[in-house]
Amino acid sequence: RAYLNNPETEIAAIAVRRPETAQAYQKSLGFSCAVYTDVAKMLHEADLDIVSICTPPSMHPEHAVAAAQAGCHLVLEKPVALNVEGFRQIRAAVDAAKVKTVISFVLRWNPLFETIQALLGAEAIGRLFYGEVDYNHGIGPWYGQYRWNRLKAEGGSSLLSAGLHALDALRWFVQKEAVEVFAYSTNSMNLELYPGGYEYDPTMVTVLKFKDGVIGKVASNIECVQPYTFPITLQGTSGTIRNNQLYSKKLMPGQTGFATIPTILPDSGDVTHHPFQHEIDHFVQCIQLNVESHANLVDAAKTHEICYAAELSAAEGRPVRLPIL
């Protein structure tokens, strides 16, 4: 839908496993295009400038490398790859082809995120020294993706499956390089609610050390029994941001409690709630202006290496120094 709404783009082709899926999309959205069941054939035959890769994560390296080698710019769903090797394969292909990329850390375009960035830029809470962002979203059989997301070979880890949205948010707010990671993980084995169970620990807490002494925490829980939440806390030398609430001794010295900012929060796990239109509009403009996206593959490597390091830390019970990617 985002491509249809952008006046500079049109959908030229879709590659799917089942043609009827593409036909249903075309009918519901009112457009027509070529339909393929073979990605390589589509890349060879169709006249494409941008390829959006929304396949299961284990397929990303194969599809992203092929699209980059075909000279296409990439919109790549997260996780980019489930391991360091897969990420490096994609990065090498992108570097060689000199194509542009945007990774779908789509919450960077959420209005609350934009508001928080403006507040941090204005030093509303002074110098940031602590931040935490959590991801709480029970992903069970009521979501179609559960059948593959629960598998180690496809979901990867709690962070790679979904929690990296929170991890990327923390990085986006802190704006400093992470230097060390320590993580713990667990699995409730709630087989009544999550039949078959997760093959990896769906609950993980990750503690991070950034340059210049900033520390942070990310909890990722995709087996929780509660409504979706994405809590944010950022503490600085002059105040605190707590979701859409601000306490700022600098801006409001007479303040006696948190002030609430009316805005759109990241309070739904439903992808229709996410600002994909802003992401696609941003990427099209990046291509037209020949500039890199702030959410490109280079930046995404810094979020993904924390995920890989957290998984290693939880498995071996030790801190992991960065970089590893």
Predicted stretch roles:
Residues 4, 9, 50-53, 211, ...:
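C-terminal helix-rich "cap/oligomerization" subdomain common to oxidoreductases
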Residues 76-77, 82, 101-103, 218, ...:
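Hydrophobic residues in well-ordered beta-strands that form the structural core
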Residues 167-250, 277-290:
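Contiguous beta-strand/loop segments that form the cofactor/metal-binding neighborhood of enzyme cores
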Residues 107-197, 317:
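Predominantly a Rossmann-like dinucleotide-binding segment in NAD(P)-dependent oxidoreductases
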Residues 17, 225, 268-280:
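Active-site loop of classical SDR/Rossmann-like NAD(P)-dependent oxidoreductases
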Residues 31-93:
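Beta-loop-alpha module in the N-terminal Rossmann-like domain of NAD(P)-dependent dehydrogenases
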Residues 89-106, 126-131:
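Rossmann-fold dehydrogenase core element
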Residues 1-30:
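N-terminal Rossmann-like dinucleotide-binding module
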